C-alpha cells in the first residue's frame, strides 16, 4: 500500500503540476466521485421522470408508449472539496410504459433501461455504465387543474477505470429513489399555454466498494428537492392527410434545495479522509423544442432539449416517442 501511495505522489516525468498530481491521487482514492457517478445516477432518474410526465400529460386515457432517448452532458468545472471536475457523459436508453383509466384517474407504469459512459480525460478515467429503473404514476384533474404524481427507483451500475499510476479497475452501484408531483393548467390564447409547477424529491445512495489496490470507499447518500417552474406553448393544426400536428416549446427554471453535495469517506493504509463532491446544481434552466403528429389512435413525436446549470453544466438531449391509444 505504501508503494502505491508513493507512486501516486511521485512525478516520474518531471512535467506534472502539483494540481495534476493531487487530481490523480484523488481519482485513485475515490474514482466514483472523480467520474461523477452521483450526477449520472440522478440524471438517469430525471430522464425516467421526464418520459413519464410527457406521456401522463398527453390527454389520452388508455395506451401503450415507448420512448428512445439519447443525450450528452458536459460538466466543465463542477466543484469538489479539492480539484474541480471536467466530465463528458453520453447516455442512450429506452423507456416503455402503459396506462389505463380508472374512473377519473389515469394510472400507469413504466420501465427504462440503457447504457452510456462518462469520461474524465484529466486522469484517463472512464465510467462504463448500465442503468435501469421503474416508475408508477397517476394523473387526475381537479377544477380544471391537471395533477400528476409519480414514484420511481433507478439504479446505475458502474465499471470504473482510471489510468496512469492510479491504475484503478473497480465497480459500484448507485441507487436513486424519487417521488414527484406536478400541477398544470392549459389556457387557450390562440395557442395553448400551459404553466406548471412541481416538486421532485431525489434520494441518492451509493454502495461502498473497495478498489483493486485496497482503497475502501464507504456508503454515501444525500437528498435534494427540485422545484420546476415554467410553461409550455403548443399549437395544433390539421393537415390535408388527416394528421394533427402540434409543435411545442417549453421553458422551466428549476431551483434545488437540500444536500447538493455528497461526503464520501475513504480509508487506505490506516488513514481516513472525507471527499466532498457536488452532484446537483443550485439552479437549472431547462428548455425543449418538440413536435407531435397524431392520426387516429397513433401518436409519433420528436423533441430536443437543452439544460444549463450554475455548476457549469450543459446538457443536450433528443427523444423519439410513439404511443398507441385504445
Whereabouts are the PLM-identified features?
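Interface/linker segment at the passenger-translocator junction
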Residues: 1-79
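Membrane translocator/pore-forming domains, dominated by Gram-negative outer-membrane beta-barrels
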Residues: 1, 10, 58-326
